[in-house]
């Protein structure tokens, strides 16, 4: 459930696969889900390279991953693949948090991975000119402040002081945005693509459920019937 929810919001993904074991059944599931929910770009990290002494085995695993990606209509031949060891990199940074580039091969692998992500996954275009819409992923209360709904803004912008509607599952209600936060920083507004927490006036935690949406008043209509295409993973 959480993997599907997260993947549906991604502009790109890092697929982690063991260099020692090769693609596992869950690797195939992650690729399939990424394809079906519309993740546009993937970069691969072959982890546990420190456990592989045979360079030919590493090349074989890379080839297997590329073929698997191609079988799900990703450009397997073109996708960047970086081999390294997350554990070794963490251990090196724990021993010396000020390690710079070129000072540790395993830390350098992570720098290379981040560089490949920056280069291969383009900055997405955001629908900031459309009416505000955000699907609610989670809800919690802040003592003395009120109720916060969190999620990724699908389109438009939301500003402090604006009226919004809470739509879906229950009767539509209205509230005023009294705060917008992202990564523990207070913002004047959030926009499409941002993962934010929206503080709502006069709303109790039990008034909002995951699956509801926050929207510009009058911009959407809830429906009780719809057509859907469903993908089922066996076993």
From Swiss-Prot:
Domain tr-type G: 1-125
CDD domains referenced in this protein's UniProt entry, alphabetically: EFTU_II
Compartment(s) where it occurs, according to its Swiss-Prot or TrEMBL record: Cytoplasm
Reactions mediated catalytically: GTP + H2O = GDP + phosphate + H(+)
Primary subcellular site in the record, as a coarse category: cytoplasm
Domain of life: Bacteria
Keywords carried by this UniProt record: Cytoplasm, Elongation factor, GTP-binding, Hydrolase, Nucleotide-binding, Protein biosynthesis
GO cellular component: cytosol
InterPro entries: EF-Tu_GTPase, EFTu-like_2, EFTU_2, P-loop_NTPase, T_Tr_GTP-bd_dom, Transl_B-barrel_sf
UniProt binding sites for GTP: 47-50
EC number: 3.6.5.3
Annotated GO MF terms: GTP binding; GTPase activity; translation elongation factor activity
Keyword Transit peptide set for record: no
Entry similarity comment: Belongs to the TRAFAC class translation factor GTPase superfamily. Classic translation factor GTPase family. EF-Tu/EF-1A subfamily.
Protein's job: GTP hydrolase that promotes the GTP-dependent binding of aminoacyl-tRNA to the A-site of ribosomes during protein biosynthesis.
Quaternary structure annotation from Swiss-Prot or TrEMBL: Monomer.
Protein name (database record): Elongation factor Tu
Organism from which the protein derives: Leptolyngbya ectocarpi (Phormidium ectocarpi)
Chain's gene name: tufA
